[in-house]
Amino acid sequence: MEILNTRRMMAIGLAGLLALRAQSCLKSYVEYFDDSSASRLSTYLSDLDAMLGGEQYGWRMEYFVGNEDGDFGGINIALKFDNEKGEVTAMSEEEKEGAYTSLYVLTTDSGPVLSFDTYNPVLHKYGTASAEYYEGRGGDYQFFIIGYDKENKVVNLKGKRNGKFCNLYPLSQPIADYNAKMFEINRNFYVSTFDGEIGGQKVTGDIDVRNHQFTAYEMETYGTDKDGKPLYDIANTITVPYILTEKGLSFYEPLKVFGTEIESLDFNFNLAQSDTTFRSASGVSFKGHIPADWLPYEFFAGTYSLMYGTTFGTGITINGIELIPEEPGVNFRVKGMSSQFDLLMDYNIRTGRIELRYQAVLRPDLDEVVIDNDQYIVVLLPWELGPDSGGLWMNPDLGMAAKWNGDRENPSFTWVDNGGSKRFSTTSFLLYYYDTDETADSPYYDSAESYSFTGGNYQLPYLRTFRKTK
C-alpha cells in the first residue's frame, strides 16, 4: 500500500465514515464503503491519491457554485495533481492563461474529504468572502468524496458548504490546451434566447450566460389574434444551472419540459455569428438567438461624444473621445476623456457591447498606471450614486455597458449597469486613490481630486449617452 505523508493523512484513524447518498435526479454516484475500519479508509484514500496523481494530463472538474445570493452555475476547472508534493495546479475557463499551484490534502471530516487547503485564486474565487459577497458566492474548496471508479476514471464529490455535486473526469490533453479551448468556447457563447417545440407544444427561453442559468418557458395558448394566429402566455417556468462542454452544454440536473427530460444540449460553436441550433440526444431541437443589439468588436472603433449628468441634474458633454483598438477583440484605449490619463473600454463578446469598468487609469499613450508618491494608484471607481447616497466598490466586474439604439447609420448608446453584480448597480464613476501600502487600514485612501475629466472634475456622475460621430 502506498504510504501518504503525515500531513496529508492527518486524523484518518480518528474519523468515522459518513454514508452520503446521491440525489437520484443527478448523475450516478457509486458508494464504495462497506465497513468503517481505519485501515480500509487509509487504503481507499491512498488509492485515490495515486489515481489523481497518476493521470497523465490531469482532470476536468465540473465546479458548480451558488448560495442564497444566487446560483452561478458551473465552471470548468482543469486540475493537475502532483501526489508526491501534495500540490495541485488549477486553471479556469474564465481566464485564458493563469495557472496557479497550491496544496491539497486527503483527510476526513465526517467522511473522506478532498480539501484544497491553501489559497488558490481559481479554487477559492467563489468561496472567499468579499465586501460585496460576505459569505462568498457559494463556492467550495472542501469536498466530501462520494466515490471514485478506477475503471471508468471518475471521481464524485460533494461540496461541504453548498452541497453541490461535482465530478472529476480525466483529460486527454494538457491542462493548458484544454483550458485555452474552453476559454474560447466560454467567451464566444453568447446566445441569449431560444425557441422550439416539444411534442407540438411551444417552448421559449432565456440563457443567462454570465451566471450559467438556462430558463425554459412552457407556453400555452389563450386565444388568437385578428389573423387567427394563436396567442401564447407562459404556463410554467423551469430554470436549471448549466456548464459548458466541448460539444455544447450540460445541465446540473435534467431540464424537464412538457414531460421530457433533457440532460444536455449540443450545438455548433462555429455558428457564433448567427442563429444556433441546440440538439439533445433524444432529438429535441431548439433554435438559439444572439441578442438583438449585438455588435461586433470592429464596429466600435471611432470618435464619440459622451454626455453625463452632474449632481445638480445638468448635463456635460465631452466631445472628441477616440476608441482605438488596443488588444484586438478584447478592448479599446480611450483617449480624450482627460488630458491627464487614458482609459480602457472592454468589449463584451457575449453581449456585443462595450463596457467601462473599474480600472487603474493609464498614462497617456503608455501601458503604465498613474501612481502618485510611488504609493497611490489612481483608479476609476464604480459608483452607485443615488438621490441620497452612493456606494463605492473596487471590483473589476463592475461597471456600465453601452446599449445600442439599433441605428447603424447614426449609432447612439445609452449607458446602463453591466450586470456585474446582483447587489450593486453602477450609475456613475469617480477617480480615487488606491493605497498600495499593505499596512493601511483600507485600500480606499481618498478622492483623487487633482485629476479630472475633460470639462469637469474627478467625478463622472450619471452617465447618459455615448454617440458615435465618425
Predicted regions and their residues:
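Sec-dependent signal peptide recognition
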Residues: 7-15
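Short beta-strand micro-motifs enriched in acidic
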Residues: 82, 107, 146-148, 324, ...
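C-terminal motif of bacterial Sec signal peptides marking the signal peptidase cleavage site
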Residues: 20-24
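Acidic/polar, low-complexity intrinsically disordered N-terminal segments immediately downstream
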Residues: 2-4, 26-113, 156, 162-164, ...
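Generic short beta-strand segments
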Residues: 60-66, 85-87, 117-123, 307-309, ...
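Ser/Thr/Gly/Pro-rich, low-complexity flexible regions
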Residues: 174, 178-470
